Amino acid sequence: METATTLEIASCSQRQVEAAADPADAKGPRTSHQQEAGSPSLQLLPSIEEHPKIWLPRALKQTYIRKAGETVNLLIPIQGKPKPQTTWTHNGCALDSSRVSVRNGEHDSILFIREAQRTDSGCYQLCVQLGGLQATATINILVIEKPGPPQSIKLVDVWGANATLEWTPPQDTGNTALLGYTVQKADKKSGLWFTVLERYHRTSCVVSNLIVGNSYAFRVFAENQCGLSDTAPVTADLAHIQKAATVYKAKGFAQRDLSEAPKFTQPLADCTTVTGYDTQLFCCVRASPRPKIIWLKNKMDLQGNPKYRALSQLGICSLEIRKPSPFDGGIYTCKAINALGEASVDCRVDVKAPH
């Protein structure tokens, strides 16, 4: 508590009452009866047992802040005996009795506002007077409310996965300083709003890490001690996050030469067959470019002979001997030829009569 006292000390001295001017006064002393009849009573001020003081609560030494619509109820302890005279003023003027009520007690004074409004903000002064003495105290009350929305928001630029925004401050800050701005984004598909910046102090920003292929809208709220503004402006244009065109540059490389001369990886196998049963011979060859396959029997070319059917696919060479007879026995040769060379494999085929 702090004592706020302004003393004005009135000089209280007794005054001697002189008799009215009379010719008999100059001639001699007056009798006692004459003195009693001619002297008025002495006028004395009432005795002050306790000087007026105001004990201001510590919380009211700073600006007292309330939200619009809340109740203001201030109890200020005072002292003074006999009971002092208490008066309140608002910005130097008398209180509006339709909005503010005051109750003065023996030891306190109460200031009450049922629903505070911004017009109730200002300097309230309490004055306690007793005789020629007085004490004063000053209380600053600030009534605040939510700010208005920013006046506009504009999508300035979009590049890569980023978007640049600009906006202007609100016209009404709610009777107090702004704590900052809250920036939110929403993609066109879901329509859900997500906060990207809170209590941001500038009026422009860059929103990053946007998803490629989505289109975004943005909005900005203003914020003060009461909270966020009730509404927020939304960007008129959507930010389309385009997928960057990918440019492929083929790296130079030396082509491998896969050409090779024919080479048999699986040779022909000798076999014995029975007269009248079809027989097949197999071998595998590798070559590039594709080789020409020639089958020989006892070094005689079998091409065009209907008794034999030769096939070659994916490097697998086969020769079918249809219903062989003892005359079909002998040495069979498979020869592969291309531009890089040739190769050949042999096998012996024996044909026996059935038992």
UniProtKB/Swiss-Prot annotation:
The modification Phosphoserine is found at S39. It is found in: Cytoplasm, Myofibril, Sarcomere. Disruption phenotype: Knockout mouse hearts exhibit a 36% reduction in fractional shortening and an increased diastolic ventricular chamber size. Mutants show cardiac conduction system abnormalities with aberrant atrioventricular conduction and an increased rate of arrhythmia. Residues 46-140, 262-346 form the Ig-like C2-type domain. Pfam families: fn3 (PF00041), I-set (PF07679). Signal peptide: none annotated. GO terms for biological process: in utero embryonic development. Keywords: Cytoplasm, Disulfide bond, Immunoglobulin domain, Methylation, Phosphoprotein, Repeat. One of its GO terms (cellular component) is sarcomere. The modification Omega-N-methylarginine is found at R322. Residues 1-41 are annotated as: Disordered. Residues 1-16, 31-41 have a biased composition (Polar residues). Disulfide bonds join C283-C334. Expressed in the atria as well as in discrete puncta throughout the right ventricular wall and septum. CDD domains: FN3. PANTHER family: STRETCHIN-MLCK, ISOFORM U, TITIN. Belongs to the immunoglobulin superfamily. MyBP family. Myosin-binding protein which plays a role in cardiac function. Seems to regulate conduction in the atria and ventricular conduction systems. This is Myosin-binding protein H-like. It comes from Mus musculus.
